[in-house]
From Swiss-Prot:
Binding-site positions, [4Fe-4S] cluster 2: 92, 121, 124, 127
Protein name: NADH-quinone oxidoreductase subunit I
Cofactor note: Binds 2 [4Fe-4S] clusters per subunit.
Keyword set includes Repeat: yes
Amino acid sequence: MVKYIKLDERAEVKSSFDRFKQFLHRTFRGELFIGLWVVLREMLKKNNSHTILYPMEKFELSDRYRGIHKLLRLLESGNERCIGCGLCEKICVSNCIRMETTLGDDGRKKVLNYSINFGRCVYCGLCADVCPELAIVHGGDYEFASEQRAFFGFKKDLLTKYDELKNQKEFTGFGSLPENVDDLIKLTPTVYTKKVDENV
């Protein structure tokens, strides 16, 4: 059991030499030299830099990093993936997503305007998790300083450009589909009936 020492039971330091000895004892303990040895050892190791030269070098981020949002396109056709369901707007906890839709000529929803207020966004990732088409994802861009508090990202800024479409990669973070997804999908009944008709 630990016995606590009352302050007045301690040995009283009387002379200045005793104070100096107490100072040396408290300063030069073993922990100080252990810490100095760790710092010196890490400093003298080659190719063991813990810092990067920021403007020239960029940090490699995880696929799960939640940076500035991106609106992806379909790789085959280049059309927008967003179907205008509005789930991202409904689930947004900071109420920063705005979407305007209209019915197109084919009777499907078309997204007219899509904006995100990055000043209000808390980058929780709920919008990307709830998206049924994986149209909105978080990118790896973390350099988005702005002079205004309300900094909006609009559809034309978030959507993948046509000339960059060949470089667009499928989202590999949380909620993405596995690479062998085609092997895991079961055939629909219409495919089965077509196969039966072909065999007859």
